[in-house]
Amino acid sequence: MDKRTDYAGNITSKYEGQEVTLYGWVQRVRNLGNLVFIDLRDREGIVQVVVNKDSGEKLMEIADSLNNEDVIEVKGKVVKRSSVNPEMKTGEVEVDATEIDVLNKSKVPPFEIKDDINAAEQTRLKYRYLDLRRPTLQRAIILRSKILKAVHEYFDEQGFIDIETPILGKSSPEGARDYLVPSRIYPGSFYALPQSPQLFKQLLMGAGFDKYYQLARCFRDEDLRGDRQPEFTQIDMETSFLDEQGVQDYTEGLLKKIMKDVMNIDLKTPIKRITWDEAMNKYGSDKPDTRYEMYLHDLSPIFKDSDFKVFSGAIADGGVVKGIAVKNGAKEYSRKKIEEKQDYIKRYNAKGLAWVKYEDGEFSGPIARFLTDENKEALKKEFDLEGGELIVIVADKWKVVTDSLDHLRREFAHETGIIPEGVFDFVWVVDWPLFEYDEGLGRWIAAHHPFTMPDDEGIKLLDTDPHKAHARSYDIVMNGDEMGGGSIRIHKRSIQEKMFKALGFTKKRAYEQFGYLMDALDMGFPPHAGLAIGLDRLAMMLAGKDNIRDVTAFPKNASASEPMMHAPAPVADQQLADIGIEVEKQYEDSVKETEQRLEKEAQEDADKNSTWDE
């Protein structure tokens, strides 16, 4: 094959008058009788190829025989187009073909290769190699590649060492479920795929590699949603002899380079810092969207003595009353639309939603009759009311109130269009609690992980009241999504033991699971700290996508399966016997059903499409 001159999408006026060799896919063919136009597509874009009667009868026949998605080689001369297409990068020129070689024909694809398609997601994933030909996905995958390039360049410039950590490790029952890999050599024992390289990278600090980074593949067996996949990539870093500021400086430098190299945006540093308490009380979230205001306001002082028992009763029971004001919401939201929000926040355990409108100097709505003149003046002052606002209020336990208003705030912001487009707003959330209470588990868990260093006061509290301790941890948030998180790590055995004890570990369990770590901490372990950024989520947001699948070449669907290769799938009985696994009877019918379905699909495919002559 002859060497390609350039990508089809890069053939601009600078090539005018030159002979070129191009390769790509046929996007579209238009036969006008004496002229045939071919849109030739590759990863960089589309260029128009023209074949006319002067090109010869054979070339005209080849051009006329082409179908969409045929793979071709084109040779020809770059000439000016008679009519410029300003919508195309290549719109000033076209290629006057002298030779076309059909490298492979294509059957009619199950969906058209273009950005706007109506194909079902399952179909797109089954034919993912076709889906990935669409320009929007190619741009997203290329953007992800540019992020990776920037990461490698930055850490190399800063003297970090790229070290791979094991994929096959030991299972830990903490956190999400592990993906388990059975051992053939040790029947009944299992490896676990890593949920993160956390302990390995800490051990590397103990080994003296004071600046580590890795693009780490991680695995979590958890329920999926738009911003999660069972396998994902972390931009992982760890350093020795640095405090929080040092790690944050490196992180800001990395983000600055990514934003410049990938988005051509100059990120302003230092990035703003707010405490966890401020984030929760002002935004209702530890992942605050700081692109817009609509802050939460504490109305407890206004209503603590109110005759409206929904408010004063909640406060008396140790709860709070908070609210947000939606500008112009008085006209935009009818009673019916507001009541729909009541059902929405019940999922966050809120008992109800109180609301009032402020128009023409008057309050109206269900709770207006309970407002004293003093209440009204206080609300006007608290929210700086100008007129036209809708005020929504939740009274309940602090966590219920903040969760409910956080989600209402986000929903109102989207509905009223106050979120600025094309803005990437970063913020550090610092000074986290060391522990948080998990209602589902009914116990305290680590807010980040069990290896996070408490602050100085928190170290003392580990012995007396650990759940009041604060952590030396920090999250980097962008546009209301957590991009990454990190912390100062525990580097002394005594503190690590206290941490495990506070989490409810017995000494036996702690040493069975993490004895190697505690032994290491006694061997001259340095102070160390680190951070991990979710590459997939960062790429998704920079690409303007709503789902991580759009920045992942071969993702799983919402059921954690992969329709193209049919993974996961049953395996041969002998393979199971080799690793000492037997499928329980209750699952045998399901496995057999899956095997039969896959066999049938394979046979139908072979019967319909195969050229194999047995």
From Swiss-Prot:
Family: Belongs to the class-II aminoacyl-tRNA synthetase family. Type 1 subfamily.
UniProt subunit comment: Homodimer.
PROSITE patterns assigned: AA_TRNA_LIGASE_II
One GO cellular component term: cytoplasm
EC code(s) of this entry: 6.1.1.12
Identification of the protein by name: Aspartate--tRNA ligase
GO MF terms held by the record: aspartate-tRNA ligase activity; ATP binding; catalytic activity, acting on a protein; nucleic acid binding; transferase activity
CDD domains in the cross-refs: AspRS_core, EcAspRS_like_N
HAMAP family in the cross-refs: Asp_tRNA_synth_type1
